[in-house]
Swiss-Prot record:
Domain of life: Bacteria
Protein name listed in UniProt: DNA mismatch repair protein MutS
BP term (GO), one: mismatch repair
UniProt-listed PANTHER family: DNA MISMATCH REPAIR PROTEIN MSH1, MITOCHONDRIAL, DNA MISMATCH REPAIR PROTEIN MUTS FAMILY MEMBER
Keywords for the protein's UniProt record, in alphabetical order: ATP-binding, DNA damage, DNA repair, DNA-binding, Nucleotide-binding
Purpose of the protein: This protein is involved in the repair of mismatches in DNA. It is possible that it carries out the mismatch recognition step. This protein has a weak ATPase activity.
Listed HAMAP family: MutS
Residues noted as binding ATP in the record, renumbered to the chain: G670, P671, N672, M673, A674, G675, K676, S677
GO molecular function, one term: mismatched DNA binding
Source organism per UniProt: Wolbachia sp. subsp. Drosophila simulans (strain wRi)
Family: Belongs to the DNA mismatch repair MutS family.
The keyword Metal-binding appears for this protein: no
Length: 854
């Protein structure tokens, strides 16, 4: 279990009394540093000095150790050496990554002018510097600090009068959500959202129940005074950010939701130091539209990671066939929040079915998608003013590929509508066959209500912007506009002239030299250069130049040196061309960013459409490769799976498929190692996949919409909360009996084994009766208590099943087949033998077993 990371754990004072050092006679640079540090005492301050970011005092001591870099010193203050360490500015992101992962906040202080500009202000003026942004775990936008296929959410939780709200946004993509919640649901919400950083009030953490929930997560916690979340302030912040008068124009908010959303925006404003990000209007997350998977079920089903914290072996590791970063992120959101609406699910399934049936369009679309960069994050950086030439180039490539994809979908649309029978060899649509499932190709492609049609429209037409960027931006991988060389020289006449000078300076000098030779008649006339005179005309002392255009510069024993106004002008152009070109490119880049900003909403819409298309084709690829089938999803209460398989276990192991027709409660008996837990989990995972809009590992599946999935499988102590294994088991079971509805799916494994036999049996039987009579939900209950099977005699919707076992020559063979009936015994001694128990212990166990049976 991971401990919570509180930022105030890392709070430290730069000096015992920082003001005493400010008053002490210091160098201008150190005085500037100390004044800035006084404003950011709780942050590491990256202070730009030339090509390095330097850290001083306690910052340096701490950073040098954590980053494994050399700790040195720079002068002294108050009679003490000043500790110092530094990192190259060009590679600072890798060091930032380490510090952010450790829970630090880093204030980035940059130079706001050049040394020459500072000199113009005065002889003793130092370069202006200021903090341009604060980097925290939840406000990262740099690609190198982010995982391509993972969201990086900043969240806030607010409570007022026992009403809770949680809001979350991602600065790197512009996504913004909010919802009402409760103390009971907080654990599930945090696990579903998985924020990197959480804003809460200092008062909020005084609640022991809140602290016990937060201890389960490795989240960077940022605490603020209650005034930071104040309602009127938050309301004003939201209205000012979105330039509206009333919040009703962008959505419905409760008072506590406004407080949560407003606090997030205020925190973004503070950390971004005036740069305005592109954020979508806050969307209400309506829980009734999604399947609720409680925190215990999320962990037990190993949706995103195994019990050991590994991604390999989780459900996401098997089903993620996406080829774009945005598709991978959206897939995780879909897995975290499966749908609970049959119409919406079936729209997704129909699109996936089309791509299952039609291989060539699927292949072509995935090929195009695989070459589309992460335009969603590049767009956000460009709008925020932190984009690079690389980002602009990636956006250009992405828009070009989006146009190609849109044209392909148009061709596909026209092809499906045409009456022609011939095969278009160029598009290779020979796989547009008659459907394996009853889904109309024409309807999926052309219907205004179809998901594919909606996706196609959302891609939009970005031809004008693409052509603009394509004419302006060279293919590049540059991380800074200050490097120059990323704008086509032909895009701008002035830049073209500067580029010509930069690339042809020798030719220009030679051309001028030849004209001077013709003018003077001196064939040996030269134009040379040195660091003192710059460019100059040189002739031997024997020659005399009479033309008025030549200005005498220097006389030597064997030569005479001159200059001309024309040569001075050329020299000035050559010397300033690079700086002028870079300045002009920066200006053009800024203009292009403005053009991108005008189209930002359309680009964001296209990026979301690309992600959806990626997932639908990925689901089809998964279905074809792993032999999945399209489930029937409706509003019934069916749960009929024919030859279902565990999607993860089957990948690397020979798997025995099992069927289930669950109308009430299935009570499953059998020994450990027989496959009960796997059977329980596989059915829950099949339900999750189906509600995502994915095909499922089975021969057939008919599932009525499930509103909630609960799981109590396995048990461990929760030491941080002070709970025993049995207490954890009881808490999880209490959640089920209190919250499950008649549309829920419950999987229960071994209730009551953490206490005495009679206690455990009594609790287990009472739970079954409650689920049957009160919750009335679909449930699979695995147990060692054979005595429980008697409930099937008086509870009409309870059926008994067992895992098939074969005994052969004194050995037990687990067949992993679930059949109707009741297990004869638990075969615990046989399992102990498989585990390697000594014969003496096994023999004694057998003796005791026979005595107990007697």
């Amino acid at each position: 279990m991971c401990n919570i990371i509180y930022n105030n754990v890392y709070q430290y004072n730069i000096l015992k009394n920082i003001m005493s050092f400010v008053k002490e006679k210091n160098t201008p640079v150190m005085e500037q540093y100390l004044n800035l540090k006084a404003q950011y005492k709780d942050h590491l301050l990256f202070y730009r000095l030339g090509d390095f970011y330097e850290l001083f005092f306690d910052d340096a001591i701490k950073a040098a150790k954590l980053l494994n870099i050399v700790l040195t010193k720079r002068g002294n203050s108050c009679g003490q050496d000043i500790p110092m360490c530094g990192v190259p500015a060009h590679s600072s992101e890798s060091y930032l990554h380490k510090l952010i992962d450790l829970g630090f906040k880093v204030a980035i202080c940059d130079q706001l002018e050049t040394a020459d500009e500072a000199k113009k202000r005065g002889y003793k003026s130092i370069v202006k510097r200021d903090v341009v942004r604060v980097v925290t775990p939840g406000t990262i936008i740099e690609d190198s600090l982010l995982e391509d296929k993972s969201n990086n959410y900043l969240a806030s939780i607010v409570e007022q009068n026992d009403e809770y709200a949680i809001s979350w946004l991602e600065l790197s993509t512009g996504k913004f959500f909010h919802t009402l919640t409760s103390l009971k649901a907080l654990d599930s919400d945090l696990l579903r959202i998985s924020p990197r950083e959480l804003l809460i009030s200092e008062k909020f953490t005084e609640d022991e129940k809140i602290r016990s929930v937060l201890k389960n997560y490795k989240i960077s916690i940022t605490q603020h005074a209650q005034s930071f979340f104040e309602y009127s302030k938050s309301h004003r912040t939201l209205c000012e950010f979105y330039k509206i008068r009333e919040l009703g124009s962008i959505g419905n908010f409760s008072k506590v939701e406004i407080m949560a959303c407003g606090a997030l925006l205020e925190y973004v404003r503070v950390t971004q130091r005036g740069s305005i990000p592109r954020l979508e209007f806050p969307k209400t997350y309506k829980q009734q539209n999604f399947m609720l998977i409680d925190a215990s079920a999320r962990r037990n089903l190993e949706l995103f990671s195994t019990q050991f914290g590994e991604k390999k072996g989780s459900l996401i590791s098997v089903i993620d066939h996406t080829v774009t970063a945005s598709g991978g992120r959206l897939l995780k959101q879909m897995l975290a929040s499966p749908l609970a609406c049959s119409k919406a699910i079936n729209l997704r399934l129909s699109t996936a079915q089309f791509f299952v049936n039609n291989h060539e369009p699927r292949r072509k679309i995935r090929e195009i998608l695989s070459n589309i960069p992460d335009i969603e994050r590049s767009l956000s950086r460009l709008i925020l003013g932190r984009g690079s030439p690389k980002d602009m180039n990636l956006l250009k490539i992405g828009l070009g590929k989006t146009l190609e994809l849109s044209e392909f979908l148009s061709t596909l649309h026209n092809y499906c509508l045409s009456e022609k029978s011939e095969i278009n060899s160029q598009m290779s649509f020979q796989c547009l066959t008659k459907e394996k499932e009853p889904v109309s190709t024409t309807q999926v492609i052309s219907s205004d209500e179809s998901e594919l049609s909606t996706i196609h429209k959302s891609l939009g037409n970005h031809k004008d912007l693409f052509e603009l960027l394509n004419s302006a931006i060279l293919d590049n991988n540059l991380s800074s506009v200050k490097e120059g060389g990323f704008i086509h020289s032909k895009y701008n006449s002035e830049l073209s002239e500067l580029s010509y000078i930069l690339n042809n300076s020798n030719k220009l000098v030679t051309k001028l030299r030849e004209s001077y030779r013709d003018l003077t008649g001196i064939a040996a006339l030269k134009i040379l250069h040195n660091n003192i005179l710059g460019y100059y005309v040189e002739v031997s002392a024997n020659h005399k130049i009479t033309s008025d255009i030549f200005i005498h510069r220097q006389s030597l024993a064997n030569s005479m040196r001159y200059t001309t106004n024309e040569l001075k002008e050329l020299e000035n152009k050559i010397l300033t061309a690079r700086d002028a070109a870079i300045g002009l490119e920066m200006k053009i880049f800024s203009e292009l960013c403005s053009e991108v900003a005008k189209e930002s909403e359309k680009i964001a819409l296209a990026a979301n459409a690309l992600a959806k298309l990626d997932i639908r084709t990925a689901f089809a690829e998964l279905a074809v490769q792993n032999n999945y089938v399209k489930p029937i999803i409706d509003d019934s209460k069916e749960f009929n799976i024919c030859s279902g398989r565990h999607p993860v276990v089957e990948v690397n192991n020979k798997f025995i498929a099992n069927s289930i027709n669950l109308a009430g409660i299935h009570l499953i008996t059998g020994p450990n190692m027989a496959g009960k837990s796997t059977f329980l989990r596989q059915n829950a995972l099949i339900a999750v996949l189906a509600h995502m809009g994915s095909f499922v590992p089975a021969e057939s599946a008919h599932i009525g919409v499930i509103d909630k999935i609960f799981s109590r499988v396995g048990a461990t102590d929760n030491i941080t909360a002070g709970y025993s294994t049995f207490m954890v088991e009881m808490i999880e079971t209490a959640t089920i009996v209190n919250q499950a509805t008649d549309r829920s799916l419950v999987i229960l494994d071994e209730i009551g084994r953490g206490t005495g036999v009679y206690d455990g049996l009594s609790i287990a039987q009472a739970v079954i009766e409650h689920i049957h009579n009160v919750n009335k939900c679909r449930a699979i209950f695995a147990t060692h208590y054979h005595e429980l099977t008697k409930v099937s005699k008086y509870l009409k919707n309870v059926k008994c099943f067992c895992v098939k076992i074969r005994e052969w020559n004194g050995e037990v063979i687990f067949l992993h087949e679930v059949i109707e009936g009741i297990a004869d015994e638990s075969y615990g001694i046989h399992v102990a033998k498989l585990a390697g128990f000594p014969d003496s212990v096994l023999n004694r166990a057998s003796e005791v077993f026979e005595e107990l049976k007697a």
